[in-house]
């Protein structure tokens, strides 16, 4: 199988994940190489927030390391969500959880010089949705839910402990623990809301 065929096959199987990855990488290249001022427009300013920044901040990253860390989690958990909910469900989860995380981050430090950015809140939402969509009466899916649930629980506990200790700093930047937890809560609420919608006859 040629490399081009393999890439085309991957894109056809998970178009939502790869479109999100492409946008995140394109935005980072644009903000670091061609339009540095664009980052300030897209990232969430806590001092003077703009409504669109609660969405666009989920597509902006501070560094390549920051981007690759989130891209890896998006690739793994995003594909899980897309397998269960489709490309639209993945995009909805990414955006809704990104907004939830950014709102939580803003409320934790309103009207300050803080700037929130990164896909971490969306990724934590994908963590939660990815696990909850596996919780079904099926041995294989339940095993997946247990393994993934243990990982997600560990991440949430680490975020909670970090908040309790006053937060952490990486590379001179404060980690958005409130955004992470907000994204996870957004994911849980999204699944609960969707589970209450009436099912189609064939579902």
Residue ranges and their predicted role:
Residues 1-203:
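A detector for small-residue-rich transmembrane helices and their helix-helix packing motifs
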């Amino acid at each position: 199988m040629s490399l081009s065929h393999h890439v085309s096959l991957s894109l056809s199987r998970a178009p939502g994940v790869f479109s999100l990855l492409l946008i995140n990488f394109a935005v980072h290249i644009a903000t670091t190489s061609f339009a540095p001022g664009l980052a300030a427009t897209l990232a969430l300013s806590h001092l003077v927030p703009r409504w669109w920044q609660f969405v666009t901040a989920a597509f902006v990253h501070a560094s390549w390391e920051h981007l690759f860390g989130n891209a890896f989690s998006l690739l793994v958990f995003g594909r899980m969500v897309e397998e269960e909910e489709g490309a639209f469900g993945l995009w909805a989860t990414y955006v809704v959880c990104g907004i939830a995380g950014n709102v939580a981050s803003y409320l934790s430090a309103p009207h300050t010089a803080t700037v929130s950015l990164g896909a971490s809140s969306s990724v934590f939402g994908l963590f939660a949705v990815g696990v909850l969509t596996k919780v079904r009466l099926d041995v294989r899916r339940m095993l997946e839910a247990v393994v993934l649930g243990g990982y997600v629980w560990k991440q949430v506990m680490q975020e909670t402990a970090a908040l309790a200790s006053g937060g952490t700093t990486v590379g001179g930047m404060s980690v958005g623990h409130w955004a992470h937890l907000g994204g996870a809560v957004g994911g849980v609420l999204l699944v609960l809301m969707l589970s209450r919608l009436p099912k189609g006859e064939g579902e």
